[in-house]
Amino acid sequence: MGEEAGVNGTGPAEGGGDEGEEDEQKQVIQRTTKFLEYDADQHEIEVEMGFEDPSNPPVPGFNLYYMQWRTRRFVEHFVVRLLTAILIVVDMIILFVDLFNPHVKNDPLEYCSLAFSTYFMIEVILRIFGLGPKVFFRAWHNALDCFLVVFTFILSVVTVCLENMPSNPVSLVVALRLVRLVRITRILWERRHLQRGARQFVSQNKRRYQQHGFDLDLTYVMPRVIAMSFPSTGRMSMYRNDIKEVARFMDTQHPGHYRLYNLCSERHYDETLFHGRVERFHIDDHNVPPLTDMLRFSASVQEWMKQDESNIIAVHCKGGKGRTGTMICVFLIDLGVFQDAEHCLGFFGDRRTDKNVANKFQGVETPSQSRYVGYYEKVVVAGRQLPLEIPMIITKITLHGMSTVGAGDGSELRFTLQSRAHTIPFQAHLGMQKNCKVMVERSVGLVHVFLLNAPIIRGDTRIMFFTDSRKIPCGYEKSPFFFWFHTGFITDNILRLERHELDNPHKSKTWNVFQEDFAITVHFETDSMTRAY
């Protein structure tokens, strides 16, 4: 397989490797570094070598491109699309009521219909301006929609004028109402507009690719690296990327030169739509990949990139943020583009975020994922040598800043402890003191948990706390807080994680409970025994 070959044959740590291959690697790094001039303070890149990022948002200001973009964002907003759909339905009802009711001079329903026609006319004009006439009229349904709106608007104006004539021809007015019924057909393709609005609403302020008739939650992180959300089918395609549109994009923009990386453990799709050019890495949502998978991923990408300078990769999880950003940062660190993981994570977040829409950061937010990118930086520095999976036993867990967490004594909490190599987790309950003994220091907000019958852990390990208390907020995994770590990176048999380094308490919405002094300290002792649990 290409993945294994990549692991064994592409790393610069191979010592006496082929000089030509090393030169090629250096050229790739030089080209990439030349493309990026990264400002660590401003978190911006300068585009060089003639590359224009098609997913790059326009520069704010009084310019045509920005005004078109703003107009498009407004007219395709989910609320505007929903309002338009409702007005189409109301307009249909008014047309039927007006048609079957006896003719009345100066009928107020005619004026309502004219008001709706005016709204539809303005809405179509805004869509033409936002998309641009060339792109708008390329789609047959847009052209037909425009014709119907303009045609029925003229009919509405004529009908109102005839209503105000001293001797209005009733039969002609009725005929015009009948003709206006063709506007009902607009409801058929309004579904498309609602889907587009829903996708923009769900993607929030992630950069979208909105060129060449596409509107996808898809970002060029680099010229040959794409981050995107899941290519979806069925109901999910109504608010995420439609898999057929993603396939059309790949086949038209990068024909024969793309490879997809699916990082979702929870869902997959028909690979034949992408001609079988899909590799899969199973990573649970909001969790971290094994360090071995990080190495395999980077080696696979490098092997694919070397085959042809036109080859690109498209990486996705569900939303195209956490797992996607983690693995893309792994590849960028391997290239040597960034000196450290922190700058690499900041770069990905800036590339994925459209600040014209909002300032919400759309990068890797989960602390454990960021921690593992930092681990990978250390692996690369060590010549791609994975750390030893040192057997360890957790002797004590200390919870800091517990005064504002539930009852303050940890009695509402329980937790699981599990290394990746084991399927059955170790469980402990603080309130029942199951597999643990608890000592509380209320005056300083400390809860000490001494583990009993603790198992030996090795390598990737997760500690996840749970609670049934409504006073303690839960987030991902229905857990108030959890975290991943690797035993090979534990120093001095102690691991301390502050609030911002814990998954879920890092979010500001939990800070009324998990205050600034909230932290966890884990105490270990090394054990060379090989018993498992």
Set out the residue ranges of the language-model regions.
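Non-transmembrane regulatory loops and terminal regions of cation channels
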Residues: 1-111, 164-193
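Structural motif corresponding to the C-terminal cap of alpha-helices
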Residues: 75, 97-100, 129-133, 157-161, ...
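Interhelical loop segments of eukaryotic multi-pass membrane proteins
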Residues: 105-112, 137-139, 194-204
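Voltage-sensing domain
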Residues: 111-189
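Eukaryotic cytoplasmic intrinsically disordered
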Residues: 185-193, 338, 365, 370
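Cysteine-based protein phosphatase catalytic domain of the PTP/DSP
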Residues: 194-313, 335-363, 396-533
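A phosphate-binding catalytic loop at a beta-strand-loop-alpha-helix junction
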Residues: 310-330
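Catalytic cores of secreted or luminal carbohydrate-active enzymes
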Residues: 357-395
